[in-house]
Amino acid sequence: MGLEEEAVQKKHNRVMIYTIFWSLVFVVVVIYLNASQLKPVKGQMRIGVTYMTMNNEFYQTLNAEIERVADEKGDLLLVRNPELDEEKQSQQIDYFRQQKVNVIVINPVKGDSPKIIASLKRAQQAGIKIIAVDSQLSHFTVDASVVSDNYQAGVLVAQRLMKQKNEAKILLLEHKGTISAEQRIQGFLDTIQSEPAYQIVGREETRGQTELALPAVSQVIQDGLVFDTVVALNDRAAIGALAAIKENQLAQPISIYGIDGSP
């Protein structure tokens, strides 16, 4: 079977992980110093961390570095996995508040979730600093934000595609409601919009997960959708697309583009 696999931005995104990590360390240190000035008794820094999911190599790598530094400094790191559930993430934020953490580091399941934002407001009112990582929150002002340029990542995918193919019938794999994922797709769409040779023939919701992308792509294949390119919001969804294409034994070559630099 002719299948062309495109690994987009792997080296770039590995650098991005460390850029986000060291930026985050700097922000936490600044907050720690400020907190120390307010509290004369020296104590352990308590940090609550909740990513949208830990089923993603990007967050696993980022968290491993944060854990390493926290261990070296003797700080307490409370890490929770909401598993893409906004209700669960809201409860985790409330738990961090009850545990009297100094800082909450959050990668929101949904940037505009009323439940998540309400919990963050309660935490902020309790004097807890809020840091958003690799995404943004709507209608809420964080104390610090450490993000990659997700829009530009989408632009780079489009530029790579147009450099390698003169035309394409594109299936998009998305995660709606997550600002970072939406920015990636928007950057891609804005870049190809003036090029009629590149057509969007389908859009599927995958929440960036392999186990959701596989059946979604299998279904569009079985429905007879004709496409020669898959553009996924991340590598987890791209891997699901690859598995679906192999499972359905497509004869024509399919290009697959993903973002994150996952192995």
Where are the language model's segments positioned?
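N-terminal Lys/Arg-rich, disordered targeting/topogenic segments
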Residues: 1-12
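Hydrophobic membrane-insertion alpha-helices, especially the h-region
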Residues: 17-33
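Periplasmic-binding protein-like
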Residues: 48, 101-110, 129-133, 171-172, ...
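Extracytoplasmic "Venus flytrap"
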Residues: 48-64, 78-90, 95, 110-111, ...
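An alpha-beta-alpha
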Residues: 66, 156-198, 202-203
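Short beta-strand elements in bilobed, periplasmic/extracellular small-molecule ligand-binding domains
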Residues: 70-82, 86, 169-174, 192-211
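Hydrophobic alpha-helical
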Residues: 109-122, 188, 207-263
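Flexible loop/hinge segments that line or gate small-molecule binding clefts
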Residues: 113, 117-152, 163, 262-263
